[in-house]
């Protein structure tokens, strides 16, 4: 039903517009132009500190409670212009850099869905489109959206890979930053007068439990900086790390363990330390029996794909939306090997993933929901009930005559 060629061309256009985090102005200008062509009135919300623009939102009138479609428009940094090329059924980068399918694929899918709905005059739910900025640097854009600007009852974040997956769980994350202060000295003449901050940091890290802690928890030290010259005992080192967990008690315990490892080693070495921790986002779980997940499963099945409910170890805008009370799932559009020069977008999956989301919107439309396979949704007293099947037209007709 969607226009495959147009979808692919839109994606290729998007990835050639640079939009690294906090520098998404050109991308938003393009989206505003495209949305206005469709007759919509896009508007900005508050922008994050240091950003060129804020998040872009569009209200799409429709039937029933508001459904949010979300995709972030920023990418990780890259040193070369992205040149998309088609090769063996994939879109890849022809310039030895990232492709930008994370998350230009999601953005392109939303644009194509809006265009298809307009062209074919399809029934659809009321929607709020939310294009966020600065997702790649800690969900910064989504975090500054005023809660009263978000009108959706539930949401769909297009920010995944495999198109058969419905992501309904993600962890909390706490970041850790530490500065270790030692004492400088000449490394060849008076090394005993110094306190080696790098050595202290190394021994502290060696004490930490890192990597996969258990099935719910991970931890990492990802950045270490320090030292001025090879012949000077380093007097200052900075560390940056993180811990993630689906379990809040485990997360608190892990980040405390990492901080204590630094403190204890600094005490043993007569060094000083300053440690800061910051919660970046909160874990979420949308229960598998939630009507949104049931609808997503129905959309996948109706397009011939076996759905898989999945937990992820990464964070996304969905964490922010769930935290403020909007049940939001993550659905994939095919992105593969993201954030690397090997990144690629399988064309068939990209097209199919977009069609699945369009099918999901049909299922979420009250008028369409009267006659779908395989699920029927009915409103009673302000809540949604999932029924095993729709009433037959003949029975409905008899009911009307009665």
Q: Which residues make up each language-model segment?
A:
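N-terminal capping segment at the start of a domain
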Residues: 1-25, 279, 336-340
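Zn-dependent metallopeptidase/amidohydrolase metal-coordination segment
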Residues: 7, 224, 235, 305-367
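A non-catalytic alpha/beta surface segment that caps or lines the substrate-entry region
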Residues: 20-65
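Active-site metal-coordination/substrate-binding segment of hydrolases
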Residues: 28, 64-126, 131, 136, ...
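Midchain, well-structured core segments that form catalytic/ion-binding scaffolds
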Residues: 80-82, 87-97, 134-267, 273-282, ...
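Phosphate-handling active-site elements
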Residues: 115-128, 208-217, 367-368
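Short, basic, low-complexity termini and linkers enriched in Ser/Thr/Gly/Pro
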Residues: 119, 261-279, 368-371, 375-381, ...
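Short, low-order "capping/linker" segments at domain edges
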Residues: 284-298
